[in-house]
A protein has these predicted regions:
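Q-loop/switch helix immediately C-terminal to the Walker
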Residues: 135-153, 165
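Hydrophobic anchor residue at the start of the ABC signature
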Residues: 196
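Conserved ABC ATPase signature
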Residues: 156-158, 182-186, 190
Length: 263
């Protein structure tokens, strides 16, 4: 069900009036009940790779990989070090320079013949590499808001309703009180939570999480895992998650892919 702009805004502002302590169950309910904005695609095939090969010099990273991700599936991506997990995610996110030479479709169309920004509009993404490269000393809320436009920094000033959804997700991740603090003054764990909020902020159709619990303390690992599980219960959401640890996977995983390193 798609809600009106007013209904969505009323939902977002309601959290300000609630009790400051929120149980994980309440947190999950808030995420599941978040009104949809109607910016959905309706293709059954969200990602389709047809005999995709990636080589760097004389080293083959991916060799004739066929892989289809259907709408609503939740994939666990695992494999040996150097097997190409991060490379595969960069292809799906349209961040790999070799993407355009490969037979890849996203959202049911010829993905790479579309504007890269059209592709990214549907994707939320976070990874340890992104965290290491993120050196913008903007207020934390502007880092989160940059996920609305898929920029590293903010190039457009967010509208009030956009700031409301940013604050809402920062509250979900437990960092609302840090919204005005410069990103580089946050602890490493707080930075990771801000980048996670950035990945979720546009309620993406495809959520790509590369080691999302990396660098978090025990409490926040539990919190983020619950957030991921709740997000997966939203209608037609698709997820690809990389982790080295089975215990980090949410109970909502439906499919698995394991990459072997090419010798």
């Amino acid at each position: 069900e798609v809600f009106s702009k007013m209904e969505r805004e009323a939902y977002l502002t309601a959290f300000r009036n609630r009790d400051a302590t929120t149980s994980f169950d309440e947190l999950q309910k808030r995420i599941i009940d978040l009104p949809y904005d109607g910016n959905n695609y309706d293709s059954d095939e969200v990602v389709k790779l047809n005999k995709v090969s990636i080589r760097y010099g004389d080293r083959t990273i991916l060799n004739e990989l066929d892989w289809t991700v259907h709408r609503g599936e939740k994939w666990a991506l695992s494999g040996e070090n150097g097997a190409g997990k991060s490379t595969l995610l960069s292809l799906v996110c349209a961040d790999n320079p070799q993407s355009y030479a490969c037979d890849i479709s996203l959202s049911g169309g010829s993905g790479y013949r579309e504007s890269i920004w059209e592709i990214k509009k549907h994707i939320g993404y976070v990874s340890p590499e992104m965290h290491r490269a993120y050196l913008k000393n903007l207020p934390a809320i502007e880092i989160v808001a940059s996920g609305l436009h898929d920029s590293i920094g903010l190039y457009k000033r967010p509208q009030p309703e956009q700031m409301a959804i940013c604050e809402w997700w920062m509250d979900i991740f437990g960092i609302a009180e840090l919204k005005d603090k410069p990103f580089l003054q946050l602890s490493s764990g707080e930075q990771r939570l801000a980048l996670l909020a950035r990945a979720f902020v546009k309620d993406p159709e495809l959520l790509i999480l590369d080691e999302p619990l990396h660098g978090l303390d025990t409490y926040n690992r539990r919190r983020v895992k619950k957030i991921i599980e709740a997000f997966c219960h939203r209608k037609d959401k698709t997820m690809i998650m990389v982790t080295h640890y089975e215990s980090e996977l949410p109970g909502t995983i439906t499919d698995r892919i394991f990459l072997k390193r090419n010798r």
